[in-house]
UniProtKB/Swiss-Prot annotation:
GO biological process: carbohydrate metabolic process; cell division; cell wall organization; lipid glycosylation; peptidoglycan biosynthetic process; regulation of cell shape
EC number assigned by the record: 2.4.1.227
Pathway in which the depicted protein is active: Cell wall biogenesis; peptidoglycan biosynthesis
Gene3D superfamilies given in the database record: Glycogen Phosphorylase B (3.40.50.2000)
UniProt keyword list: Cell cycle, Cell division, Cell inner membrane, Cell membrane, Cell shape, Cell wall biogenesis/degradation, Glycosyltransferase, Membrane, Peptidoglycan synthesis, Transferase
Chief place where the protein resides: membrane
Record protein name field: UDP-N-acetylglucosamine--N-acetylmuramyl-(pentapeptide) pyrophosphoryl-undecaprenol N-acetylglucosamine transferase
Organism: Salmonella arizonae (strain ATCC BAA-731 / CDC346-86 / RSK2980)
UniProt keyword Repeat, yes or no: no
Keyword Zinc: no
Length: 355
């Protein structure tokens, strides 16, 4: 086996926050000659996205258990067992030297299958609070890493793997020091948008007038409604798009970002070196709050939880930040970011792989 390329199976799915960091590590190792195969589910985003990146994907049938009712919970052991058997059969065929769990429902049965076959299991937790699947898998994993401190008490903090075009952006001092004119506000709600952002930011624009210029990513199907809201607020000049294909270019344009605080978003904003107003998605474990807290503690961001996220609060916050303040915050964001997360995760995969 010594002359043959090493084999990695990445287990990740469901959301971009799981899939994109996995892709970053996969590409890094493929450039070193590794063979990579992906384990996912056929009805989530990875089914289309991963093959576009030149990686073969295998599917198992598994879904989440939250909010499914008593019947689904009673059936869960059988479903998990079947998914475990499917994952085990796939791994017997591919024979990975190591598996990398990046989150999503697929990681549970996939990690158990690898463990049962004696394959090393590397886990990476993207969020500030560990998900249920990773909490279980951490007990059997060879190595556990985390993006933010606090998800696991003794795991190494390695950051989140971030896209190379974001890492390649000029430093905040280079981008921002000579800017003048209206503050450039980038509003990002994710691919599905965020209703609270779509409803609130047109009112913020009305309060701030010519002091800001806004680029607002509304999410699928919301562009016309949000454009109309800006027009009705007397602020039709602001740019609204459903999606932003080139996030690095958007970050380069912005002076400040207003957004949810998903793990990958927070990590990208820190790596780009941008101040932010975060409005965490309201979830019972406050996962997005804990993702954003390190940047707020560093003086690089402000968290406004959804009940406090009013047009008045956002407008007052933006109006209170001078260009010098924004530059200082941007430099603090960049200073706390972990820029070599991809290399750190990949190095651990290499270290624990079967010889």
């Amino acid at each position: 086996m010594s002359g043959q390329p090493k084999r990695l199976m990445v287990m990740a799915g469901g959301t971009g926050g799981h899939v994109f960091p996995g892709l970053a590590v996969a590409h890094h190792l493929m450039a070193q000659g590794w063979q990579v195969r992906w384990l996912g589910t056929a009805d989530r985003m990875e089914a289309d996205l991963v093959p576009k990146h030149g990686i073969n994907i295998e599917f198992i049938r598994i879904s989440g258990l939250r909010g499914k009712g008593v019947k689904a919970l009673l059936a869960a052991p059988l479903r998990i067992f079947n998914a475990w058997r499917q994952a085990r059969a796939i791994m017997k065929r591919f024979k990975p030297d190591v598996v990398l769990g990046m989150g999503g429902y697929v990681s549970g049965p996939g990690g158990l299958a690898a463990w049962s076959l004696g394959i090393p299991v590397v886990l990476h937790e993207q969020n500030g609070i560990a998900g249920l699947t990773n909490k279980w898998l951490a007990k059997i994993a060879t190595t556990v890493m985390q993006a933010f401190p606090g998800a696991f008490p003794n795991a190494e903090v390695v950051g989140n793997p971030v896209r190379t075009d974001v890492l390649a952006l000029p430093l905040p001092q280079t981008r921002l020091v000579s800017r003048d004119g209206p503050i450039r506000v980038l509003v990002v709600g994710g691919s599905q948008g965020a209703r609270v952002l779509n409803q609130t930011l047109p009112q913020v624009a009305a309060r701030l007038g010519d002091a800001v210029t806004i680029w607002h990513q509304s999410g699928k199907g919301a562009q016309h409604t949000v454009e109309q809201a800006y027009a009705e607020a007397g602020q039709p000049q602001h740019k609204v798009t459903e999606f932003i294909d080139d996030m690095a270019a958007a970050y380069a344009w912005a002076d400040v970002v207003v957004c949810r605080s998903g793990a990958l978003t927070v990590s990208e904003i820190a790596a780009a070196g941008l101040p932010a107003i975060f409005v965490p998605f309201q979830h019972k474990d406050r996962q997005q709050y804990w993702n954003a807290l390190p940047l707020e503690n560093a003086g690089a961001a402000k968290i406004l939880e959804q009940p406090q996220f009013t047009a008045e609060a956002v407008a007052d916050t933006l109006a209170g930040w001078s260009r010098d303040t924004l530059l200082t915050m941007a430099e603090r964001a960049r200073a706390v970011s972990i820029l070599d997360a991809t290399e750190r995760v990949a190095s651990e995969v290499i270290r624990v792989a079967r010889t």
